[in-house]
A protein has these predicted regions:
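Cysteine-centered motifs
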Residues: 12-14, 21
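P-loop NTPase switch module centered on the Walker A-proximal segment
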Residues: 46-154, 158-160, 209
């Protein structure tokens, strides 16, 4: 059912208690295993209380893609930009909020689907960080059954992989709205153009870039908003200013 995530993990801690979400109602589980409802259906996250949102202001978005393409890193960046965390973790360091399980931190990849709630403007987005390796495909299927839309992550360095196509097929099966997000654009070997060409070859006119990267001296310095035909230059990790669109 839409807007309902059943038995999905939430990567936040409330007084050292693991918080889970069942039928969209926050439930705490203390060390003795006793369940308790959090007051007013709110939970504490980093000292802040997250408000209750009506269903029309809630979106469940699944993050899909091949193993190692950057899904968890993207989710971590979303949490940082929206203020859920004040420090961005790294998969390599085993300190991301979605891969909090000891086994995940040890293996450096996701084993189960994790729910990371973020707030963007007046909408609550339940981001579902799914595993990329086929051994855990059941976790992906469950996330997609609860999702309103999906983001398929593709590495600009590795390009389109088997997991990319599997993710598309899973979305097609459910007629789920989807978009692609290209990662690793700060890598010298990344090629946004090659990714777009390969996706277009596979899926035809369904592929339409909304943004195009700006590179100078082999560095990723900004992007072009294709819809608005406006250039953007990065100033900090999550900030940018308007700039000229390169002639190339």
């Amino acid at each position: 059912r839409k807007n309902i995530v059943q038995f999905a993990k939430i990567s936040c801690v409330c007084h050292e208690n693991l918080v889970q979400c069942i039928h969209n109602i926050p439930i705490g589980v203390n060390k003795s295993g006793v369940e308790f409802l959090l007051p007013w259906f709110m939970w504490q996250n980093g000292g802040r209380y997250m408000d209750v949102y009506k269903y029309e202001k809630i979106r469940n978005v699944a993050i899909l893609g091949h193993g190692g393409c950057g899904k968890t890193t993207l989710v971590e960046a979303m949490a940082y930009v929206t203020g859920v965390v004040n420090r961005q973790g790294r998969v390599e360091d085993g300190n991301t909020i979605s891969d909090y399980d000891k086994e995940e931190a040890k293996r450096l990849f996701s084993i189960s689907t994790t729910l990371v709630p973020v707030i963007w403007e007046d909408t609550k987005i339940n981001v579902l960080d799914t595993p990329g390796y086929f051994d855990f495909v059941g976790e992906v299927e469950e996330a997609l059954d609860a999702a309103d839309a999906a983001v398929i992550v593709v590495s600009g360095k590795s390009g389109v992989e088997v997991g990319t196509m599997k993710a598309w097929e899973a979305c097609e099966k459910r007629k789920l709205p989807r978009m692609f997000f290209v990662t690793d654009m700060d890598d010298d070997n990344a090629s946004f153009r090659k990714v777009v060409e390969d996706l277009t070859e596979l899926y035809g006119k369904k592929i339409a870039p909304f943004h195009s990267p700006i590179r100078e001296n082999e560095k990723f310095v900004g992007f072009v908003n294709v819809i608005k035909m406006a250039g953007r230059r990065f100033t900090k990790l999550s900030d940018y200013v308007e700039g000229e669109i390169p002639e190339y």
